[in-house]
Amino acid sequence: MQQLQNIIETAFERRAEITPTNADTVTREAVNQVIALLDSGALRVAEKIDGQWVTHQWLKKAVLLSFRINDNQVIEGAESRYFDKVPMKFADYDEARFQKEGFRVVPPAAVRQGAFIARNTVLMPSYVNIGAYVDEGTMVDTWATVGSCAQIGKNVHLSGGVGIGGVLEPLQANPTIIEDNCFIGARSEVVEGVIVEEGSVISMGVYIGQSTRIYDRETGEIHYGHVPAGSVVVSGNLPSKDGKYSLYCAVIVKKVDAKTRGKVGINELLRTID
């Protein structure tokens, strides 16, 4: 694995010179191997180690290099044709392979090669980009988007129209992460490497980036870049220092534990916010 990483790191330093016509065999094979390992879930761009999320930057570099070494090609699918550098994940799947891997894909959901989809996942008409990792038991609802290299945990619900930001465009240092047992409400956006910690509930229409103030109304604390575990979050506003205007923020209205979540439905958690 170290040799593979060294090849990727070296090639990335001269990425501006690499084109589909001049990419050398060693680099091409290394990039293709990494994409295959990401596709199978054997590797992932980010993982939790000793309680902390660690981003493997060299894997992200391999994803970026794949756009340098591959030319556009005609892609068949959904009774249409496409023209892109990245093949579709399910292009060569037959019924036996779908049965073996154990997830559902509703047309016209699109998943790029290099994204991992775990067992018991349901993909409604949605989009999952290269390098993403979607863990077991997750629902990606209609028109939801899982961005490049984003990490989605177990038993997550991404509601209709949710956007989970990627790292490729614009280039971000770390992927956006939604931990296990989270609910992301319809049309919400979580981007720029924000981490939504385990068991959190994000209401409909909440937008969170690195500069978004995440205000805990019980403690008065303001968080940036992460939603603490077990938070129930709605959209809100905070006043300016001079009191002349207010600016958007996300508000943590309560904290819940797994026991409470097990007894109370998601809708009930969001309705009783006073």
UniProtKB/Swiss-Prot annotation:
One GO term describing the cellular component: cytoplasm
Location (main, coarse): cytoplasm
Record key words, sorted: Acyltransferase, Amino-acid biosynthesis, Cytoplasm, Diaminopimelate biosynthesis, Lysine biosynthesis, Repeat, Transferase
Binding site for substrate: R104, D141
Subcellular location: Cytoplasm
Catalytic activity line of the entry: (S)-2,3,4,5-tetrahydrodipicolinate + succinyl-CoA + H2O = (S)-2-succinylamino-6-oxoheptanedioate + CoA
EC number: 2.3.1.117
GO molecular function: 2,3,4,5-tetrahydropyridine-2,6-dicarboxylate N-succinyltransferase activity; nucleotidyltransferase activity
Entry's Gene Ontology BP terms: diaminopimelate biosynthetic process; lysine biosynthetic process via diaminopimelate
Pathway connected to this protein: Amino-acid biosynthesis; L-lysine biosynthesis via DAP pathway; LL-2,6-diaminopimelate from (S)-tetrahydrodipicolinate (succinylase route): step 1/3
InterPro entries, alphabetized: DapD_Trfase_Hexpep_rpt_fam, Hexapep, Hexapep_transf_CS, THP_succinylTrfase_dom1, THP_succinylTrfase_N_sf, Trimer_LpxA-like_sf
Subunit structure: Homotrimer.
Similarity comment text for this entry: Belongs to the transferase hexapeptide repeat family.
NCBIfam families documented for this protein: dapD, PRK11830.1
Protein name from the UniProt record: 2,3,4,5-tetrahydropyridine-2,6-dicarboxylate N-succinyltransferase
Biological source species: Shigella boydii serotype 4 (strain Sb227)
